Swiss-Prot record:
Transmembrane annotation, as ranges: 58-78, 97-117, 151-171, 173-193
Tissue localization of expression: Ubiquitous. Overexpressed in various hepatocarcinomas.
Membrane topology term: Multi-pass membrane protein
Known role: Functional component of endoplasmic reticulum-associated degradation (ERAD) for misfolded lumenal glycoproteins, but not that of misfolded nonglycoproteins. May act by forming a channel that allows the retrotranslocation of misfolded glycoproteins into the cytosol where they are ubiquitinated and degraded by the proteasome. May mediate the interaction between VCP and misfolded glycoproteins.
Organism: Homo sapiens (Human)
Induction notes from the record: Up-regulated in response to endoplasmic reticulum stress via the ERN1-XBP1 pathway of the unfolded protein response (UPR).
Stretches of the chain found on the membrane's Cytoplasmic side: 1-57, 118-150, 194-239
The name this protein goes by in its record: Derlin-2
This protein's encoding gene: DERL2
Pfam families (UniProt xref): DER1
GO molecular function: protein-containing complex binding; signal recognition particle binding
Family membership: Belongs to the derlin family.
Length: 239
């Protein structure tokens, strides 16, 4: 019975969020079980382009370090904000969501050549958080019961938290930068006088991922409750 409930809950996660989160968990599990090592996964331009280890372009986004607080923290944020984006502003637009993944991954890989980062998964998570926060500007957040703020400040609060933990903020800044580029090109520039939509999802992605029918049993994660693990519950201003 418990297995069936977990299975149904798992299958209710939208496809892109389910696939990416599962890939991250399985990759970490494989490293933890010593089936593979991080040295086989990290981003290394020389190994990619000279030795054709193309898989590193993907695997460096899937490993978040050994199982521990940092891994759990990243997985919770990745799952929650990836799912809320897919069920919110990308509802019924799976191809556009996949294209955002590809565009963000491409920019991070390009910038990664200059900032010497070997794993980009955390930056990718911050990008998702940034896009969600800009598209939900009136949602109020609570940071461990200590700090109240509106959603657009969330990426910066997370960066400050990383700084307090003694981590490098380069990863957070990269995620914020890529998230802002996507948000500007997709949401801001097209609505300016004379603006055009530069980011157009290729028709092949639409043919593969977009389906005309919507599942009547779909149970979305409420976008107005972004608090989640250890954050308290978010609430809209005026609500």
């Amino acid at each position: 019975m418990a297995y069936q409930s977990l299975r149904l809950e798992y299958l209710q996660i939208p496809p892109v969020s389910r696939a990416y989160t599962t890939a991250c968990v399985l990759t970490t599990a494989a490293v933890q079980l010593e089936l593979i090592t991080p040295f086989q996964l990290y981003f290394n331009p020389e190994l990619i382009f000279k030795h054709f280890q193309i898989w590193r372009l993907i695997t460096n986004f899937l490993f978040f370090g050994p199982v521990g607080f940092n891994f759990l923290f990243n997985m919770i944020f990745l799952y929650r904000y990836c799912r809320m984006l897919e069920e919110g502003s990308f509802r019924g637009r799976t191809a556009d969501f996949v294209f955002m993944f590809l565009f963000g991954g491409f920019l991070m890989t390009l910038f990664g050549l200059f900032v010497s980062l070997v794993f980009l998964g955390q930056a990718f998570t911050i990008m998702l958080v940034y896009v969600w926060s800009r598209r939900n500007p009136y949602v109020r957040m609570n940071f461990f019961g200590l700090l109240n703020f509106q959603a657009p400040f969330l990426p910066w609060v997370l960066m400050g938290f990383s700084l307090l933990l003694g981590n490098s903020i380069i990863v957070d800044l990269l995620g914020i930068a890529v998230g802002h580029i996507y948000f500007f090109l997709e949401d801001v520039f097209p609505n300016q006088p004379g603006g055009i939509r530069i980011l157009k999802t290729p028709s092949i992605l639409k043919a593969i991922f977009d389906t005309p029918d919507e599942d009547p049993n779909y149970n979305p994660l409420p976008e107005e409750r972004p608090g989640g693990f250890a954050w308290g519950e978010g609430q809209r201003l005026g609500g």
